[in-house]
């Protein structure tokens, strides 16, 4: 009986997890008005510390089209002279990502956020040529408030990743190596990571 109960419970948990996964990619919730949009497709990438790559007018037509998550170092080449702890791959350097997208009129006082699950390393995020946010690490997720920089119609988001200052004892990767979502919500909303479960025990 215990085996049956454990199996049933495992199936129940799997169902809950699947339902949550579907909800993340769904349209705006009728109850909250919150909309979470997968932002992993249609990015362009170039390696190198390029000047003015954050601006609206920058020509990225020659850049490589990529889909997130993306790690520029795995393209190689391997360097036998490098230490093996980092895979002998060229992960040190600067890389730029750009994505052009269109935002419809929200029709109200909305907030727009970009949630990055991981960018290696020291990322700077620009919206329409303006610095919207930055993060001083590479392994943790972070949120950028784009509300004051976004506009109705055409927009460009640009991300600069710099691994030159990052130290490691293992292979860290390089670039936007985890997923990104754009979250649109009402002006009054529950903030990111603001829900908690407590117990008197």
Where do the language-model regions lie?
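N-terminal secretory signal peptides that target proteins for export/translocation
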Residues: 1-6
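Intrinsic disorder/low-structure terminal segments
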Residues: 8-11, 38, 44, 57, ...
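Accessory carbohydrate-binding/adhesion or oligomerization-edge regions at the termini
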Residues: 24-84, 88, 102, 156-162, ...
């Amino acid at each position: 009986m215990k085996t049956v109960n454990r199996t049933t419970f495992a199936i129940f948990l799997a169902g809950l997890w699947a339902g949550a996964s579907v909800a993340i990619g769904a349209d705006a919730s009728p109850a909250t008005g919150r909309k979470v949009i997968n932002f992993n497709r249609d990015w362009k990438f170039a390696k190198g510390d390029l000047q003015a790559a954050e601006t609206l007018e920058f020509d990225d037509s020659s850049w490589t089209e990529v889909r997130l998550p993306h790690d520029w170092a795995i393209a190689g080449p391997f360097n036998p002279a490098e230490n093996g702890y980092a895979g002998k791959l060229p992960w040190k350097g600067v890389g730029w990502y750009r994505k052009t997208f269109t935002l419809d009129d929200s029709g109200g006082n909305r907030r727009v956020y970009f949630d990055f699950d991981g960018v290696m390393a020291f990322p700077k995020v620009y919206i329409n040529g303006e610095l919207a946010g930055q993060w001083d690490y590479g392994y943790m997720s972070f949120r950028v408030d784009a509300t004051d920089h976004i506009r109705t119609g055409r927009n460009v988001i640009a991300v600069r990743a710099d691994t030159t200052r990052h130290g490691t004892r293992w292979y860290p990767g390089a670039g936007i190596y985890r997923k990104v979502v754009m979250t649109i919500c009402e002006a009054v909303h529950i903030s990111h990571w603001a829900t908690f479960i407590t117990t008197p025990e």
